């Protein structure tokens, strides 16, 4: 239809394009790629459809399907064509397509109508007929090529050519000193050295060749393989490249390049035979940057576990890679530096038992410091921040695990920045729990400030939208007035914990879910054990059913958490417009306290709901990632 429409357009003539026709909501526009056999079957059916009682049919099964076209001869048979569904944007990310239909108006004028945006593509798979036809064409082409290149000329025939006598060049006078016969001066030592160098590199272990190339610069896998093949690679080593890269290199998800892991730099040899003098100088610079700062990093880490944003931007300890890069514009943000002097050193991310008391007193920061969000299950550490986006026929539905609606399972605003309600409440509950904890209790995980946990999220901190600025205001709410009632709230929380559990340690465990992580709680979440890689369509359907079963609950919890956060955002915006110390300013403070108490009474299970919401977020994102990986594997297997 598209080809016919294009053929009907005339040069030097204008056409009007009508978009957004009414009544077209039930039409899905697809880009169909047919084989020659399928086209011939459709054309045959079109020419004999009045004589054939059956009609063509198409059936979708996930990302695959079956197309049935009736035959004219034999009469009652059909031709089956398998096909698979893919996303047009993934195959051609630089362009997009609209489906245009050419029609004739009542006046006879030609006009164009836009039927919709093409998002999905159907590719019909080749059949045995297609393979047989290709084989016959190849045989015919070979025969024609052979006939053109070979001609038998019989003696006395019409194709006998003229004989051409070729004069021999006169022999040159022999030189009395044959050693002088050298057209250009050559140094054979260079040639021997090059040959020896190439051969010696190809004889080295494949792993050593990989790490010595990655030590100089980052390579993408195809580039690295092409570079290795210059020196010679056998098939066995070529197949083991992926396993070696997983062992010795880190993958940069932005450009899919590989960089050498830090511990492998100790294995490098400066006199590697494949290195030129320039390569050795480059290696010296890399090694001096990698090995020497590691000592400085260890000493500075023992002195101060948290570095300010200024140090993070200028310190050479950080690897100069995209994964650890911190924007220099972060220098002006002083929120981390307030916490630097107030958090005690940690050992592997945990507080020493002797440091618990000091950390307990440090949890409520002063007004100038940022309030770290204590998240029981931080969704920002999802293994799938951007799951594979595969598309099927309902690709516009965000509530399906294979849909494109990644806005439903992103890093949520309430879990990324934290709500002020949680900050205000945990300010007291965490301190109360830590102070009542005996020295011999479980290890405590010291909460890291949000700026250190997520440095990448602040790359564009100076270009924040108004919405992001409002979210940051949550963390900057002044709590001077709250400290006046600290003792009352402390006693209230202590009494609440005592009533909730007869055992003080159990009460601490229940009330401090956000700030405590016992060593026994380091087990994997249940969904990581239950939901493993998908190997069948039945397993995929079960995962999809589980996703849909809990999706509504997740959305409801998410909406409740966001509602709580927005109340305090609004109050904080009012407070910022007032001058400190004024009566209106104090009134807003009182309103914040009242709202805090109101939320606390109306939502006594706030922490449990937030934990459940973040648990569902991680679980659904995990399921969505598995389904996306399975769909991507199936689509690649059809290509």
UniProtKB/Swiss-Prot annotation:
It holds the Pfam family Occludin_ELL. It comes from the Eukaryota. The keyword Transcription regulation applies. Belongs to the ELL/occludin family. Its main location: nucleus. Residues 525-635 form the OCEL domain. InterPro entries: E3_ELL-like, ELL/occludin, ELL_N, Occludin_ELL, WH_DNA-bd_sf. GO terms for cellular component: transcription elongation factor complex. Residues 175-203, 291-326, 378-416, 439-513 are annotated as: Disordered. Ubiquitinated by SIAH1, leading to its degradation by the proteasome. Interaction with AFF4 stabilizes ELL2 and prevents ELL2 ubiquitination. This is RNA polymerase II elongation factor ELL2. Residues 291-317 have a biased composition (Polar residues). It is found in: Nucleus. SUPFAM superfamilies: occludin/ELL-like, Winged helix' DNA-binding domain. Keywords: Nucleus, Phosphoprotein, Transcription, Transcription regulation, Ubl conjugation. The keyword Nucleus applies. Residues 378-401 have a biased composition (Low complexity). Component of the super elongation complex (SEC), at least composed of EAF1, EAF2, CDK9, MLLT3/AF9, AFF (AFF1 or AFF4), the P-TEFb complex and ELL (ELL, ELL2 or ELL3). Component of the little elongation complex (LEC), at least composed of ELL (ELL, ELL2 or ELL3), ZC3H8, ICE1 and ICE2. Interacts with AFF4; the interaction is direct and leads to stabilize ELL2 and prevent ELL2 ubiquitination. Interacts with EAF1 and EAF2. The modification Phosphoserine is found at residues 501, 579. Residues 457-469 have a biased composition (Basic residues). Residues 480-490 have a biased composition (Acidic residues). Elongation factor component of the super elongation complex (SEC), a complex required to increase the catalytic rate of RNA polymerase II transcription by suppressing transient pausing by the polymerase at multiple sites along the DNA. Component of the little elongation complex (LEC), a complex required to regulate small nuclear RNA (snRNA) gene transcription by RNA polymerase II and III. It comes from Mus musculus (Mouse). The lineage of its organism: Eukaryota, Metazoa, Chordata, Craniata, Vertebrata. GO terms for biological process: positive regulation of transcription elongation by RNA polymerase II; snRNA transcription by RNA polymerase II; transcription elongation by RNA polymerase II.
């Amino acid at each position: 239809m598209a080809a016919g429409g294009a053929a009907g357009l005339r040069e030097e003539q204008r056409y009007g394009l009508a978009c957004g026709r009414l009544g077209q909501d039930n039409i899905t526009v697809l880009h169909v790629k047919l084989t020659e056999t399928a086209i011939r079957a459709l054309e045959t059916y079109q020419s004999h459809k009045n004589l054939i009682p059956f009609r063509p049919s198409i059936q979708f099964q996930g990302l695959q399907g079956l197309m049935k076209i009736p035959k004219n001869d034999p009469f009652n048979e059909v031709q089956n064509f398998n096909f698979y569904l893919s996303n047009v944007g993934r195959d051609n990310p630089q362009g997009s397509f609209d489906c245009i239909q050419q029609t004739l108006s009542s006046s006879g004028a030609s006009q164009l109508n836009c039927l919709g945006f093409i998002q999905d593509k159907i590719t019909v798979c080749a059949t045995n007929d297609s393979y047989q036809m290709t084989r016959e064409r190849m045989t015919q082409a070979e025969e024609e090529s052979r006939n053109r290149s070979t001609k038998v000329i019989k003696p006395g025939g019409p194709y006998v050519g003229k004989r051409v006598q070729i004069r021999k060049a006169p022999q040159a006078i022999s030189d009395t000193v044959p050693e002088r016969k050298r057209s250009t001066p050559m140094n054979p030592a260079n040639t021997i050295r090059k040959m020896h160098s190439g051969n010696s590199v190809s004889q080295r272990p494949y792993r050593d060749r990989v790490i010595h190339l990655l030590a100089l610069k980052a390579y993408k896998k195809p580039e690295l393989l092409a570079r290795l093949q210059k020196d010679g690679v056998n098939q066995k080593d070529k197949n083991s490249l992926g396993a070696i890269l997983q062992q010795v290199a880190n993958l940069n998800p932005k450009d899919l390049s590989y960089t050498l892991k830090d511990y492998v730099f100790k294995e490098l040899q400066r006199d590697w035979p494949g290195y030129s003098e320039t390569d050795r100088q480059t290696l010296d610079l890399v090694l001096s940057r990698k090995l020497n700062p590691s000592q400085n990093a260890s000493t500075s880490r023992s002195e101060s576990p948290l570095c300010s944003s200024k140090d993070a931007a200028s310190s050479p300890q950080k690897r100069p890679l995209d994964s650890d890069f911190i924007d220099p514009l972060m220098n002006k943000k002083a929120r981390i530096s307030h916490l630097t002097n107030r958090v005690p050193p940690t050992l592997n991310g945990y507080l020493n038992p002797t440091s618990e008391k000091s950390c307990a007193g440090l949890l409520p920061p002063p007004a100038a410091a940022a309030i770290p969000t204590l998240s029981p299950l931080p969704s920002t550490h999802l293994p799938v921040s951007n799951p594979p986006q595969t598309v099927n026929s309902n690709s516009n539905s965000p509530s399906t695990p294979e849909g494109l609606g990644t806005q439903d399972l992103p890093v949520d605003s309430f879990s990324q920045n934290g709500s002020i309600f949680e900050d205000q409440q945990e300010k007291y509950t965490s301190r109360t729990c830590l102070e009542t904890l005996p020295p011999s209790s479980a290890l405590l995980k010291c909460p890291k400030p949000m700026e250190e946990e997520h440095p990448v999220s602040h790359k564009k901190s100076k270009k924040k939208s108004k919405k992001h600025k409002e979210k940051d205001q949550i963390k900057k709410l002044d709590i001077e007035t709250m400290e006046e009632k600290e003792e009352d709230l402390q006693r209230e929380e202590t009494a609440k914990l005592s009533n909730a559990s007869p055992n003080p340690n159990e009460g601490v465990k229940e009330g401090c879910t956000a700030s405590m992580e016992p060593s026994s709680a380091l087990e994997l979440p249940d969904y990581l054990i239950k939901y493993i890689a998908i190997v069948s369509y039945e397993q995929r359907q079960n995962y999809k059913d589980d996703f849909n079963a809990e999706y509504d609950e997740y959305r409801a919890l998410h909406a409740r958490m966001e509602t709580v956060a927005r109340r305090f955002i609004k109050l904080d915006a009012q407070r910022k417009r007032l001058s400190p110390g004024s009566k209106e300013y104090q009134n807003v403070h009182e309103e914040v306290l009242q709202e805090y108490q109101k939320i606390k009474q109306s939502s006594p299970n706030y922490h449990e709901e937030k934990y459940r919401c973040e648990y569902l977020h991680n679980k659904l994102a995990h399921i969505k990632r598995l389904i996306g990986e399975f769909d991507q594997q199936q689509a690649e297997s059809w290509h």
